[in-house]
Amino acid sequence: MARQIKKSGARKTKRNAVNGITHIKSTFNNTIVTITNLKGETLSWSSSGASGFKGAKKGTPFAAQTAAEKAARQAMDQGMRQTEVLVNGPGAGRETAIRALQAAGLEITLIKDITPVPHNGCRPPKKRRV
């Protein structure tokens, strides 16, 4: 019988990045927080869904706050202290996620809104009738 050889796959390496960029994508249904170094390599990420929220609760500001805290904790364990924040999307959790990053202990050096705005491109979804 042949011996099993263990393959050493890609392991998570601890990166020491003091500065980084936090990308917050806030849609109506979910909020995704990704923290990268200055090159754009992901250090940590979290989302409302990954934080345990399901369905309509994923779009709430509290879910965004929980996701931001979780991502910030992981990034700070890898040595991050300062971050720039790039906010994208029209969702409810935008400001709450930024406040949660500050409360977690990250120093925010820049806040930039990079939400794409059409110059009258595609037709938007129809309005809801409740």
From Swiss-Prot:
GO biological process terms on file: translation
Keywords: Chloroplast, Plastid, Ribonucleoprotein, Ribosomal protein, RNA-binding, rRNA-binding
Superkingdom of this protein's organism: Eukaryota
Pfam families: Ribosomal_S11
Gene Ontology MF terms: rRNA binding; structural constituent of ribosome
Localization (cell): Plastid, Chloroplast
Gene3D superfamilies reported for this sequence: Ribosomal protein S11
Cellular compartments per GO CC: chloroplast; ribonucleoprotein complex; ribosome
Subunit structure: Part of the 30S ribosomal subunit.
Entry similarity comment: Belongs to the universal ribosomal protein uS11 family.
Name used for this protein in its record: Small ribosomal subunit protein uS11c
Organism ancestry: Eukaryota, Rhodophyta, Bangiophyceae, Bangiales, Bangiaceae
Gene: rps11
